[in-house]
Regions:
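Rossmann-like NAD(P)-binding element
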Residues: 29-47, 57-61
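Anion (oxyanion) recognition and catalysis
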Residues: 10, 53, 78, 109
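Rossmann-fold NAD(P)-binding glycine/threonine-rich loop
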Residues: 43-46, 50, 63-106
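A short helix-to-beta-strand connector/capping loop
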Residues: 32, 79-82, 146
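Short amphipathic alpha-helix with an adjacent loop that forms part of the alpha/beta core around
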Residues: 25-33, 75-76
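Hydrophobic beta-strand scaffold residues
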Residues: 16, 59-60, 84
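C-terminal substrate-binding/catalytic lobe of Rossmann-fold NAD(P)-dependent oxidoreductases
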Residues: 2-28, 41, 110-212
Length: 212
């Protein structure tokens, strides 16, 4: 993802201060002037989030797989006063799907619909279910009152496909998103980075998009 983000930044004429796999090697004086976009691994983010909060102007996190320390991370960013935007998926299209699924779930509540989520990704993806599928499941449960089962598939080089199904005795509704490449995730992360100007606190990307 790092190379994708670099490509989007170059395309938009945004200066890249540093692109590194060792964030702790960055000069703290430089870091304080920069927004960092983190697409690493769950273990790397867990090890580095305090350094990111302590040293950077703002932080955008696209890494998933740190749900078990989410409360701790958010609390620390508030404690040190560094703005942070995080998301399981920065694709603008996926975030539109989040909003659509939320609305449909609310409408269908009490009418006998059973939800199910299917997600397919490339074989290199470390987490299953995907962070996006977990967000979708949370949205469905909140609106419909039923927690959906999730089916995860890992095959080939699939960038990411998510399908949310609502099935009743009389019909079936499908809401889906298929990524053609990973560039959409990078574009959304750059959008998030531009949102950090004058931002305070910790925010999930989908909420900022809905309330813009």
């Amino acid at each position: 993802m790092g190379h994708m983000v670099e490509g989007v930044l170059h395309k938009q004429g945004i200066e890249i201060a540093s692109a590194t796999e060792d964030v702790c090697s960055i000069d703290p004086a430089l870091a304080k002037q920069c927004v960092v976009i983190d697409f690493t691994t769950p273990d790397a983010f867990k090890a580095n989030y305090r350094f990111l909060a302590d040293n950077f102007k703002a932080v955008v996190v696209g890494t998933t797989g740190w749900d078990e320390i989410k409360t701790e991370v958010i609390s620390y960013f508030y404690q040190v006063g560094t703005p942070m935007i995080y998301s399981a998926n920065f694709s603008i299209g996926v975030n539109a799907v989040f909003a659509a699924v939320a609305k449909v779930s609310e409408i269908l509540k009490g009418y006998g619909y059973v939800p199910h989520i299917e997600e397919t990704h490339h074989v290199h993806k470390l987490d299953a279910p995907s962070g996006t599928a977990k967000v979708l499941a949370s949205i469905v449960k909140s609106g419909l009152g039923i927690a959906p089962d999730i089916t995860s598939v890992r095959q080939g080089e699939v960038p990411g496909t998510h399908v949310v199904k609502f099935k009743s005795e009389v019909d079936k509704i499908k809401i889906s998103h298929e990524a053609f490449s990973r560039e959409g995730f990078a574009e959304g992360a750059v959008v998030a980075a531009t949102m950090t100007e004058d931002l305070k606190g910790v925010h999930e990307f989908k909420e900022l998009l809905l309330n813009k």
